[in-house]
Amino acid sequence: MLRTFQRTLTKCQTPSLAIRKQCFRRQFANARSTKYMGRSGSSLRYGPWLTASALIATSLCFYDGTVQNDEKNDGSLPYNESVQVDSSVSDFPLTITALNFPVSTNFKLLGYGQRHVTFLRFKVYALGLYLAVNDEDLIANTFNEAYLHKYFLDVDDSKTFKQNLARFLKRDDPKSVMMIDDLLDSGMRMLAKITPVRNTDFKHLKEGLVKTISKHPDVANNKETLENGLEELNKAFSRNGSVRKNDDLIIELLANGALQFSYHDNKNNEFEVMGLVNNQLVGKFLFSQYLSGDKSPSPQAKKTAIDKLITLM
């Protein structure tokens, strides 16, 4: 088996297979017994030898051809690159893919920042906001010249389209919230990675999400529907216990507006899919708060995400 691994590694060292090599090396490093929660309430354990055998098959598959997925595999994705969001936790990857996280598609980092509790003046968690790679076109499809002139009377014709767009998105008024809500209504998939910078628990994480959602300006107009959605959130987030510093809460906004929650035990490199919230308002209001308004949990993450979003037009 060792010789087989050596032969496979030799094949993967071909320059044209650089991306596949990175994937194989990452998988090889995780060849110890791991736990992956394939669906809520179920778990799978793989012994080292079974995992090693699977890795050989995976490496050969990568050598002979690209892995088939529900989306095209963008070879330009910098799988091994990252950015420091907070010095007390691991760097955030520039991309999150189904190869290393329990997600449905490839995501790339849009913005990042920290969540502070103002009155206590301490940091709570690091936040990364990711956009589905294949959904970039939805930005330009939603925000165009006709859109701006339809909803805004103060379009400055002396400025470029991007300059006007940036001005409207950064104003922190009801119309900037409306713009982000329209973008989310297009079916754009997003992901939030929350990494505590101090030990906490699932209860506090859930309460933080509920508070963020409840601050959306349209809550009063959707009270009954949102109450049902928060009930769903409570059931999907039913896990109790502590969450260590540097663990990850992964929140994926699906194309149909549902939210998928996953937990990453960073110390043991184990993933658990916690649950699904089908109520569309919950996901929409959560990510709308991340990207707009004056009550975003991380103004820094909002600013960097909006700046990046504009460059993608």
What is each PLM-predicted segment?
Residues M1-P48:
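N-terminal mitochondrial targeting presequence
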Residues S262-L276:
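Short, compositionally biased
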Residues S238, R244-D265:
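Short tryptophan-centered beta-strand motifs in secreted/extracellular beta-sheet-rich domains
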Residues Y36-K245, E272-M313:
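Extracellular glycan-recognition regions
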